[in-house]
Swiss-Prot record:
Residues 1-18 form the signal peptide. This is Chorion protein S15. Keywords: Secreted, Signal. The keyword Signal applies. The keyword Signal applies. Belongs to the chorion protein S15/S18 family. It comes from Drosophila grimshawi.
Length: 102
């Protein structure tokens, strides 16, 4: 029970530090971008791997803490390619793929 409480507390503080307007990352409101991809490893017998990484280190820590209780695996980033319509400073505000600002 102590470990569960400690895990929840760590995940909560990681999420709080990843959110809010104080952290400056790429894309919307300074939250950073976290992308997920499920890699099946070329067969049905293998456990799928959840891949995730962020432009913001605290957001990556929050994603790792949150996903470790659900599905363990390797973490890495996959970007979404798109174009920007208005060339906003914090990333695209429209266009194909939504523009993650990378």
């Amino acid at each position: 029970m102590k470990f569960l409480i400690a895990f929840v507390a760590i995940a909560f503080f990681a999420c709080v530090s990843a959110g809010g307007y104080g952290n400056i990352g790429l894309g919307g409101y300074g939250l950073g971008n976290v992308g997920y991809l499920q890699n099946h490893g070329g067969g049905y017998g293998r456990r799928p791997i959840l891949i995730s990484k962020s432009s913001n280190p605290s957001a990556a820590a929050a994603a790792a803490a949150a996903s470790s209780g659900v599905n363990s695996g390797l973490y890495n980033q996959r970007g979404v390619i798109g174009y920007e319509l208005d060339g906003g400073i914090l990333g695209g505000h429209g266009g194909y793929g939504g523009g993650l600002g990378y």
